[in-house]
């Protein structure tokens, strides 16, 4: 269990393995919006500084290793809420003719929107990953996913709604649904 804020501990790992590191998939994060608002300095240090630590060490010790960053759709702020959704029986969807029907790509602006503290810290991380790719030649990519779930998802109220919904159902605890008349807007990615 390594804290990505601890540069010296990370550096020992990179020094030990150097170019034998063939791929970096960076998915470490502080994922809670509410927690980020309560502790913005800690949130920024985990999401932004931790990413910067990994990028710098990749550049120094494992330059040829592709760097895959698990970002978030929260870097777009509230811009996705402005999309022209149409209501269906069980969910909201965007028109098949809309340029974002197959998903939002990097053409959607990160600017001129309201971000959460979490969104800002991940936005910084996302942008610095891009800069290391463009300016330093690292092989970088950012995946801006939404509603990620899986077998190790914590099922916490503040993040991970699908696993929390299942957990609430099993324990017969109340689960509150906010917005969009209780209909699904985003797809879950497993």
Task: Indicate residue ranges for each PLM-predicted region.
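Conserved sequence/active-site signature of Rossmann-fold short-chain dehydrogenase/reductase
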Residues: 5, 75-76, 148-150, 189
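Conserved mid-core alpha-helix of short-chain dehydrogenase/reductase
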Residues: 9, 53-56, 128, 188
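Conserved Rossmann-fold NAD(P)-dependent oxidoreductase catalytic core, especially the SDR/UDP-sugar
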Residues: 23-26, 53-115
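Flexible cofactor-recognition loop at the NAD(P)H-binding site
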Residues: 29-30
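Conserved catalytic Lys-bearing alpha helix of Rossmann-like short-chain dehydrogenase/reductases
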Residues: 48-54, 121-129
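NAD(P)-dependent short-chain dehydrogenase/reductase
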Residues: 81-103, 117, 127-188
